Design a protein with these regions (language model features):
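Charge-rich, low-complexity N-terminal segments
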Residues: 1-135
Length: 135
């Protein structure tokens, strides 16, 4: 199994309906190939972790990378893992408002990622949320 973490920027700020559609499709697609993960959205920025069988994660990531709705896709980490950090989450999620408009995103994300035992992974998500709240 592997875990892949990436960040990207949406071409347009996603509406709540857009995010609901993204999550619905992600959960359906991920469950079908045994991929789990977490998506945090702050304004137009997305931070996402995907974990599961290597072929499934890489296929999912490449499909996401081809999506024209976003750009500046940067892979932050990709590592072999022996256990999942996101359990049975086909795709957990937390959405904030535009950067600087949502001080609660930090607390929400910190609570969401508290069970994650990998401090580096947890730090990516909490750091992202803190930057979104402070921007």
């Amino acid at each position: 199994m592997i875990r892949l973490l990436y960040i990207s920027t949406s071409r347009l700020r996603p509406t709540p309906a857009d995010l609901a559609d993204i999550l619905r499709a992600s959960r359906r697609n991920n469950a079908a190939v045994d991929v789990t993960g977490l998506l945090i959205v702050g304004g137009r920025r997305f931070l996402q972790a995907l974990e599961g069988p290597q072929d499934a994660v890489m296929t999912t990531y490449h499909r996401i990378a081809q999506d024209p709705r976003h750009y500046a896709i940067v892979q932050l980490a990709c590592e072999t893992i022996t256990e999942r950090q996101f359990g049975d989450w086909a795709m957990g999620a937390q959405a904030g408002k535009a950067p600087g408009e949502d001080a609660t995103i930090s607390a929400s994300v910190a609570s969401l990622v508290a069970p994650i035992t990998d401090p580096s992974l947890r730090g990516y998500f909490t750091g992202f949320a803190e930057r979104q709240a402070a921007a």
